[in-house]
Amino acid sequence: MALIAQKPKGTQDVRPEEVYKWHTVEKLAAETAECYGFKEIRFPTFENTKLFKRSVGDTTDVVQKEMYSVTAKSSANGKDADDFALRPEGTAGAARAVIENGLLNEALPQKVYYLISCFRHEKPQAGRLREFHQFGAEMYGSALPSADADMIAMVKTFIERLGIKDIVLNINSIGCPKCRAEYHKALKAYFESRKEELCGTCRERLEKNPMRILDCKSPICQDIAKDAPVILDYLCDDCSGHFEKLKKHLDAMNIEYTVNPKIVRGLDYYTKTVFEFVSTHIGAQGTICGGGRYDGLIEQLGGNPTPALGFA
């Protein structure tokens, strides 16, 4: 008899004898987070679509091409329909949850972690599935560069406890809206001069958000981006000072890092510090953890101005 249905493309089953591996990773993640003062939070698998459009960014690939959205009719005649989306990442849902549940009215900083499934409609390949699983953590209420360093240290500890070796830490600052405006002008002027060489997606990005071109995986676009203006040359005094202090904290903690000005991350909410832990053995999908600061997101979602940072 033929199988009625198979698992959806880009998903996976975990056989009983393999589940222990998942338990091991999840246990180490929870133990590491709690050692650093983080508490577990849980939030829905789906949220109002507007949450992700507002936070992740209307022009990002995640929102434009990869989100699983559904319209739920709330009445018999189809009026008053609600738009929902399966979460493509965890930061937006966690931020919404801490605002709605009043955690930011309690003692700060608030530190939460989560172990969740996320969903993106992208081409399945090695290291990229349409349903994937994340360990993430968020800290709300500290603007200090030392908080960035502590978050990076926690990720490093977790990776070491997993026994993963040959990992490189890349860091960058993408500034704030104030200094990024001048950088966008310089970046757009540079790529405009080579527009016809860019891939079709990056020609669209040039009009909407030229920083996204730096994140393109096309070898041609990567080669063009090698000589592009560097964000570190455009940082305001506050952002530059923050980044220099972060490096000093990492040096004091004996955490090795590489400054990589091409790291911009793929989501619009990031400000100042961004970082990635990259495996030197996996290849094109070598980033095993990414994160950074997003000081404007809480206010953007309707909360009081609150500095924040996180990773997944």
What label would you give each PLM region?
Residues 1-312:
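TRNA-recognition modules of translation machinery and tRNA-sensing kinases, especially anticodon-binding
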